[in-house]
Structure formats: C-alpha cells, structure tokens
Amino acid sequence: MNLSYTARQFLTLPALIWVCLSAQAGRPLTVDDANVNDTGVAHVETFWSRGADGARVLTIAPTYSPLQGLDLIAQDARTLSGGPHSQTIQTKLQLSQPRENGCHTALVFGATHWQKGQGQSGFMSANLSCDLAPGALHWSLVSSRSPQGADVPSLGVAWEHVMGSWTGHVESVAQRQAKPMLGVGLRRDILPGLQLDGTWGRMGGQTLFSLGSKWQF
C-alpha cells in the first residue's frame, strides 16, 4: 500500500510512518491489506508526504507479482530536508484467495535499511481483509524491531468504501510508546492504469498528509 511503518518513534523518524507501520501498504492506505497484484502485473507508487513533525518525504515503491499470491516490493523513502533516507524490501504472501462476502489473509516479511549510520530493522505483519456488502475492512498486526533491538508492535484498522468513481477510507493505527494516528484518504483512477490519491490525518495533535499516484502495467 500505505507502511507501515515502525521500528522508530513516529515523531523522530517521520519517513517510517509511510514505510514500516503496515509494511508498504497499497496507496493511499497506511494500514496494509491482504491483497496482491495479479500474476505478471507490476505497479509503481510515488508519493510526497508531510510527517507529524513537518518533515517532507518523497517515496517511490515498485511492486511486481511473479507468481500467484506473491508480491515483491521495494521502497525508497527520502526526507527532502536532509533527514532520514531509507530503503525497504519486502515480500507479501497471500495465504487465502479473496472471495465475495468473505475474508482472506496474507503475511508480509521485510527489512528496512537507513543511510547515514542509522542502522536497519526487520518486520513482519499478519493482514486480514474482509469483503463486506458496503465496503472492505482491513486489519494489520505488525511486529517490527528497531535498529536498537527493541520490539515495536503496532495494530492498524482501515475501512474502505466506494463512492461512484472515488474510493474513500478511514483508518487508525496504534503503536507502542507512540500517539495513535487517525486518518482519511481518497483515490480515483483518472486514466486506465493510473490512479491519483491523497490522505490527511492527525497524530499527537499534529497534522500529516500525502499526495501520490499509482501506475499499474
């Protein structure tokens, strides 16, 4: 997606709010889902985000699905003001197939490396997505280890709802020793294979937002 994003304090490493919390969630979600691309399909997500501390981050995240139920994901997140710069690689394995009015699951495994001597960390998440009559519900439980070796768990919940040509969502993320995040977002396909999206949220009394795109081919 959208993360995820842990292995750091939300306010001190703002880039990670979009990197490790839910692993790399599909835009514009922060909470990861249990969905994957169709076999042989790739996409590239590019988005600009403002963290709760005001830092601006540019993120580029390509994804490719070489096999059914498998996504291979890379991500580069660069703080434009010269702060943290990270690269993330992760694998998402879908454990059960999506079904109408039912639920499916996925596991995610990944690692993030920070430049400028800030170390690296690993993470994994268990994701559940349910197709319900009015929309879709997503849960993501993440276990992440900080560069200092501390376990930093988080739990995210998101609700998506289709409104004509737009899809909106509301989501919340709770992480140990951090203020909870509450956010909303919108996405829309403007051309075949091209999506534009945006998010707005609050965390610890501060505002965070993002603008992005997703190109699928």
Segments from the language model and where they lie:
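Transmembrane beta-barrel domains of Gram-negative outer membranes and organellar outer membranes
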Residues: Q24-F217
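Cleavable N-terminal export/targeting peptides
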Residues: M1-T30
